[in-house]
Curated annotation (Swiss-Prot):
Membrane-spanning parts: none
Entry's family note: Belongs to the prokaryotic molybdopterin-containing oxidoreductase family. NasA/NapA/NarB subfamily.
Protein name: Periplasmic nitrate reductase
Keyword Transcription regulation: no
Length: 834
């Protein structure tokens, strides 16, 4: 090889890459074209999924002299086809912030732990000794219900699986929940209530087949920009394709919209029922499909808003005790139910032009038009989020536009493994792997058999969900708490009155594992430095059911260790005698005296794969420390839950050779569309369509009404507050705000406001203001000219900025079914800063 990468060679390599991609041939990383001249030849390139959102883009990661020095879009990745968004282009910088945590930090006073002490560096042994002492104290004094963990949709699959074993099988506590409770819980519950199985039936290939795209509360242009390019390509390349965008304000996705619709907050429920009514009234119901593949139910109403039980709103709610209850009805009853949602009534309630409403309804009603519905936080962060999700399924089921190329109700995901880890692994307070639940005795028994632990170990009662965890910390009922891969003191709702006070409650011991000193970390008693992204071997599952695995490419900074290493290493400090009931141990004496490390990891199926099976070209810190191929063992044991049950995963080693596969993977073949014959191996010849998650093979169409938000503007608090993200930053900004280019692009949050509203208050562009709610206040600055154009009476404030904690202001109302927080609707007032 010559010492220089010449222009001709670069062009030849580029042409080869394009040809190979077109032919579906995977080139080795070294053969992929990269810029950089001679230095590029000294860089080792390996594949990985992007660290940020749930799209699951593939990237090539360049390592030189033990550091990640560059990344570029992976041309062999089907998801993004070589593209990255602005965040993805700067992935190489997220691990190298100047304030990276490199050693455990414990609050101390006079050389010993003290809740009111200052952080001091300690060894891992001292950190775990104090941590174990506090955990054992709480277990002894109050039992398993006082121990909890808050995890993440950014956990790798291995980390989430190790955590669910430690909490449920080790400490016998279901107080395990992910921050995905804040983003995907409503979607997951709606999938289960409608189809009996979680996650989308379609895939990203639908983008190239659909004739219409309808965005419900999703600003894809900024939040899922790579997928947005596929919509834009389809819309601009074919004259018949239409795009409808529904939102409470005008944003960048509206720029491509043929049907732009700004509705009053919460009234999307009205629009959904109107569309169902329109389909029925105009005679466009797919009667054969509905007759053979669906059933109808009516949901209970007046279900409350997930506030504290003593809140007057909850006390007055008629059915807050059982919000999931339904009763069977027939099509005629459903028809009568939605008939009141006329065009005129819908236009009046929502504020949307009647013409736009009718155009939207026609997209769904036209039997010749394939429709892809897409949604994310606008639907999910909603006090009736489960209903909203189910109501869009109503529309697709009434028309039969589902489970085939281009006809796809598609729930987009916010985090890189909210699907793969939070949902598929089952790190929610009520779930087990592969859609199993702790409340089902057969599911618990099955899990105990796979885990090779005695029956009766896994508790049957669901644990505290995310918002409830904050309340229980505040009330002193949850006293040992471990937080990994999230920043909930910044990200959670009503943080001033619930979250922060719970962390600083003297009765509680709080541990936070993180890579940077976030607000959450600085609110803790013990901070554990965490390895990031390619500093460990990992696996994510994206929004289209694609599981993607990567190797460890570099070593972690300082003494930082992965969350997986922390979980498994910590388990060594507990014996079964300290955490399991005596009666279970008496009946199973072989478990006595063993550590949780031995029972859950080393001596289980997890520990059976030797180090020799690790690719010799890559390091694996955790496996080297424990003496066996930890990640492979965890994955294969976890995969046993789903194989043969419609959640089939390929053998672990296969994932290292591809850019992910979409489950179910049967006989080495991934599944693009579920529930339809010819695509899904679980649908037998002659069955056509079968929603096999439900025993009768039928999907559910539900009749539920519009109900108002938990809090609406009044004379004093006269403005709606909506929170969310911006293109340049991700979540709380703990990574992206440390990338100089991203920081400069959007250095601080702004209050996006209607210009007339600002003028009426005497506020100019850039004026400093106070945003005040019944719960708290922050300061921000007015933005009337930016990318978001607000209607009168609505403001938008992104939550990435730690200097503007907008969640001090938000309301901790949740969907009573999913327990997911509504960050999109609360009442505030705007005051100038004198």
């Amino acid at each position: 090889m010559s010492s220089e990468l010449t222009r001709r060679n670069l062009l030849k390599a580029h042409a080869a890459g394009i040809a190979a991609a077109t032919a579906g041939i995977a080139l080795p990383a070294a053969a992929q074209p990269v810029p950089g001249g001679v230095s590029a030849l000294q860089i080792k390139w390996s594949k990985a999924p992007c660290r940020f959102c749930g799209t699951g883009c593939g990237v090539m990661v360049g390592v030189k002299e033990g550091k990640v020095v560059a990344t570029h879009g992976d041309m062999q990745a089907e998801v993004n086809r070589g593209l990255n968004c602005i965040k993805g282009y700067f992935l190489s910088k997220i691990m190298y912030g100047k304030d990276r945590l490199e050693t455990p930090l414990l609050r101390k006073k006079n050389g010993v732990y003290a809740k009111d002490g200052e952080f001091e560096p300690v060894s891992w042994d001292e950190a775990f000794d104090v941590m174990a002492q506090q955990c054992k104290r709480v277990l002894k004094e109050k039992g398993p219900t006082a121990v909890g963990m808050f995890g993440s949709g950014q956990w790798t699959i291995f980390e989430g699986y190790a955590a669910t074993k430690l909490m449920r099988a080790g400490f016998r506590s279901n107080n395990l929940d992910p921050n995905a409770r804040h983003c995907m819980a409503s979607a997951a519950y709606a999938f289960m209530r409608t189809f009996g199985m979680d996650e989308p039936m379609g895939c990203y290939d639908d983008f190239e087949h659909a004739d219409a795209f309808v965005l419900w509360g999703s600003n894809m242009a900024e939040m899922h920009p790579i997928l947005w390019t596929r919509i834009a390509d389809r819309r601009l390349g074919f004259d018949h394709v239409r795009v409808a965008v529904l939102s409470t304000f005008t944003h960048r996705s509206m720029d491509l919209a043929d049907i732009p619709m700004v509705f009053k907050p919460g009234t999307d429920l009205v629009i959904l029922n109107y569309i169902a009514n329109h389909i029925i009234k105009t005679g466009r119901v797919n009667e054969d499909f509905v007759r053979n593949h669906t059933k109808f139910v009516r949901g209970v109403t007046d279900i409350g808003y997930g506030l504290r039980p003593d809140d007057p709103v909850e006390v007055n709610a008629a059915n807050s005790a059982d919000p999931t209850k339904t009763e069977a009805i027939d099509f005629e009853t459903f028809k009568e139910f939605v008939s009141e949602y006329t065009l005129e009534k819908t236009a009046a309630m929502t504020g949307v032009e009647a013409g736009f409403l009718e155009e939207l309804a026609e997209l769904y009603a036209d039997p010749k038009r394939k429709v892809m519905s897409l949604w994310t936080m606008g639907f999910n962060q909603h006090v009736r989020g489960v209903w909203a999700n189910q109501m869009v399924y109503n529309i697709h089921l009434l028309t039969g536009k589902i489970s085939e190329p281009g006809n796809s109700p598609f729930s987009l995901t916010g985090q890189p493994s909210a699907c793969g880890t939070a949902r598929e692994v089952g790190t929610f307070a009520h779930r087990l792997p592969a859609d199993m639940t702790v409340t089902n005795p057969e599911h618990r028994k099955h899990a105990e058999e796979i885990w090779r632990i005695p029956h009766g170990i896994i508790p049957e009662k669901p644990g505290y969900h995310a918002v409830q965890q904050d309340r229980m910390l505040h009330d002193g009922k949850l006293n040992f708490y471990w937080v990994q891969v999230n920043n909930n003191v910044q990200a959670g709702p009503n943080t001033k009155n619930e979250t922060y006070l719970g962390y600083r409650n003297p009765e509680n011991f709080i541990v936070v594992s993180d890579a940077y000193p976030t607000i959450t970390a600085m609110s803790a008693d013990l901070i554990l430095p965490a390895a990031m992204w390619v500093e460990k071997e990992g696996a994510y599952g994206n929004a289209e059911r694609r599981t993607h695995v990567w190797h460890q490419l570099v070593e972690a900074s300082g003494e930082a260790r992965s969350d997986l290493w922390q979980l498994v290493e910590f388990s060594k400090r507990f014996t079964t005698d300290e955490v399991w009931p005596a009666e279970i141990l008496d009946a199973n004496p072989a478990y006595r005296g063993k550590t949780l490390y031995e029972v859950l990891y080393k001596d289980s199926d997890v520990g059976k794969f030797p180090l020799s099976e690790i690719n010799a070209d890559y390091k694996n810190q955790e496996s080297s420390d424990f003496g066996f191929y930890l990640q492979k063992g965890l994955f294969e044991e976890y995969a046993a839950f789903g194989r043969g049950h419609g959640h089939d995963l390929a053998p672990y080693d296969a994932y290292h050779e591809v850019r992910g596969m979409r489950w179910p993977v049967v006989d080495g073949k991934e599944t693009l569309w579920r529930y339809r014959e010819g695509y899904d191996p679980y649908v037998k010849p002659g069955e056509g369509v079968k929603f096999y998650g439900n025993k009768d093979g039928r999907a559910v169409i539900i009749a539920v009404p519009y109900e108002p938000p938990a809090e609406s503007p009044d004379q004093e608090f006269d403005t709606w507050l909506v929170t969310g993200r911006v293109l340049e930053h991700w979540h709380s900004g703990s990574m992206t705000m440390r990338v100089p280019e991203l920081y400069k692009a959007f250095p601080g949050a702004r209050c996006f406001m209607n210009a007339d509203d600002a003028r009426k208050r005497g506020l100019n562009q850039g004026a400093e203001i106070r945003i005040v709610s019944r719960r708290g206040e922050i300061r921000s600055r007015v933005e009337t000219r930016g990318r978001n154009r607000m209607p009168p009476g609505v403001i938008f404030v992104p939550w990435f900025d730690a200097s503007q904690l907008i969640n001090k202001v938000t309301l901790d109302a949740t969907d009573p079914i999913s327990k997911q927080t509504d960050f999109k609707k609360c009442a505030v007032k705007i005051e100038p800063v004198a």
